[in-house]
Regions:
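Active-site rim/loop-helix segments in enzyme catalytic domains that contact anionic ligands
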Residues: 1-74, 99, 103-109, 140, ...
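Hydrophobic/aromatic beta-strand patches that form the interior of the parallel beta-sheet core
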Residues: 11-13, 48-50, 80, 115-117, ...
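Proline-aspartate-enriched helix->loop->beta-strand connector
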Residues: 44, 67-86, 91-94
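Flexible loop residues that form catalytic
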Residues: 18, 52, 84, 119, ...
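The feature marks non-catalytic terminal segments
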Residues: 42, 109-201
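Conserved strand-to-helix beginnings and helix N-cap segments that scaffold or border functional pockets
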Residues: 25, 60-64, 91-95, 128, ...
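Helix-loop-strand module that forms the ligand-binding subsite of alpha/beta enzymes
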Residues: 83-109, 115-123
Length: 201
């Protein structure tokens, strides 16, 4: 939301079809509508839905090549991906996939800055961003995902995660998000090696 406020161009790739996030017969179509509505609120310039099978995301060479191609087409200054210790298997697979895609283009003329973000649990973080003024807007976007919110109280859980990130921040900061800002030279390591290095710090 801060990116939208500052006029920064952003793009979103949704990797899986969301088919296992409930029992509704039209769940895939519903989740597609939800993500399109949320993307509109967040101001993404483009939305890419790849429809890989939910909970079975596999970072094969083909999908890594596809991700690498999108990155080279968009030429972003930064690529965001889920943190390495997320609970959902697709989130962890997405992190590995993006890392390998960035490794593929590391020797080319540009390399985006890799930054991981938190979804459901605290991950290694070396950057905290105050989202106090964006928290209501973030909650409004999360409320769009009615198909998922009826399965669990995700907006409350995410708000709790954001509240927890204020532990070391000034008291006027009510909500914050945690990120890990990697250096491009880190791409010389495998994702497993880099994760162990980060956790051992």
């Amino acid at each position: 939301m801060k990116a939208k406020e500052r006029g920064i161009e952003t793009h979103l790739v949704v990797l899986t079809d969301g088919s296992r996030g409930g029992n509704s017969s039209d769940l895939v179509e519903t989740r597609n509508r939800e993500v399109k509505q949320a993307s509109g609120m967040l101001g993404f310039k483009s939305l890419h839905c790849w429809s890989e099978p939910d909970r079975f995301l596999d970072p094969t060479e083909d999908i890594i090549e596809k991700a690498s191609g999108v990155i080279q087409d968009l030429l972003p200054s930064t690529v965001f991906f889920p943190g390495p210790v997320e609970i959902h298997p697709d989130h962890r697979a997405a992190a590995l996939l993006v890392w390998k895609a960035l490794q593929k283009i590391r020797c080319k003329e540009f390399t985006p800055e890799p930054i991981s973000y938190e979804i459901g649990v605290q991950n290694p973080a070396n950057m905290l961003i105050d989202i106090t003024t964006q928290s209501r807007g973030k909650d409004a976007v999360m409320q769009i995902y009615a198909s998922q919110n009826k399965e669990n109280n995700y907006p409350e859980l995410v708000a709790a995660l954001d509240k927890g990130r204020t532990f070391s921040l000034p008291k006027e900061v009510k909500f914050a998000e945690g990120f890990f800002r990697y250096q491009t030279k880190d791409l010389g390591l495998s994702f497993d090696e880099m994760t162990h290095l980060v956790i051992d710090l």
